[in-house]
Design a protein with these regions (language model features):
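Conserved PLP-binding active-site segment in aminotransferase class I/II-type PLP enzymes
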Residues: 1-14
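Active-site loop ensemble at the mouth of alpha/beta enzyme cores that anchors a bound cofactor
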Residues: 234-240
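Conserved PLP-enzyme active-site core in the AAT-like
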Residues: 20-222, 229, 235
Length: 240
């Protein structure tokens, strides 16, 4: 598939103000291909609350087939990153929202450390979507979305998207090469389905956010409820 045909990749890239976007046959294909950017035996720093799909790719596949090693961290402070970094560390993998706590990682610390140490910074933005957070503007090199849920608006279509930030031509060239060689492209029909979902993504996210906030406030006001974990409440550690 030529870049000019990748309408979904372009649509996501435009939303994030990236340089280029690639659509993949599934979210898992997108995750796995990004890992192929690093050499065999490389070390990766990652969040300790990854999605189950990503964790399986890390531990059950890439550790065995590519000899990759991983350090899972609870936070991305400069102190923690310096402590776990190794000579062969090549990439930092974060999620825009940690599961299941929905804590917000220190994005500035991640991107600052990555740039200072010439590491690739990756953000899985599946949960937040481009409407709630823009990792490209936050300084990340690569942004990944599993398009099956929020982006498409349904659960009946598989797809994944990877956006590369401007100024990362080497990553862009290598990622495009890997996608073509591995054949993990998304059909035009599937792209169209997801793009249809993108057309009302902002409306859906805004409505879901309002509904969630109302429910959280209702539960928080109930004395019989022990605690409520919601970013929109002042009681949340990352409320701003």
């Amino acid at each position: 598939m030529e870049d000019s045909e990748d309408k979904l990749g372009k649509a996501i890239s435009d939303l994030l103000s990236g340089n280029i976007g690639y659509s993949f046959s599934s979210g898992k294909a997108a995750f796995a291909t990004v890992l192929d950017l690093v050499e065999t035996g490389a070390h990766i720093i990652a969040s300790d609350n990854l999605s189950n799909d990503v964790y399986k790719i890390f531990e059950s596949v890439r550790r065995r087939t590519s000899g990759l090693t991983f350090s899972y961290v609870k936070d991305f402070s400069q102190e923690t990153l310096k402590l776990v970094k190794q000579e062969n560390t090549r990439l930092i993998w974060s999620e825009s929202l940690k599961r299941p706590s929905f804590r917000v990682p220190d994005f500035e610390s991640i991107t600052e450390f990555a740039k200072a140490n010439e590491l690739i910074s990756v953000c899985d933005n599946t949960l937040a979507t481009p409407n709630l957070f823009n990792p490209v503007q936050a300084g990340f090199d690569i942004v990944i979305h599993d398009a099956k849920g929020y982006l498409s608006g349904t659960m009946d279509v598989e797809g994944g998207c990877v956006v590369v930030a401007k100024g990362q031509e080497f990553i862009q060239e290598k990622l495009g090469f890997l996608q073509r060689v591995l054949g993990s492209v998304l059909s035009l029909d599937e792209q169209k389905k997801i793009i249809t979902g993108l057309n009302n993504l902002e409306e859906r996210i805004e409505q879901q956010s309002r509904n969630a906030h109302q429910i959280a406030e209702f539960l928080f006001s109930d004395d019989t409820v022990a605690s409520v974990n919601h970013l929109g409440l002042k009681s949340h550690p990352d409320f701003e």
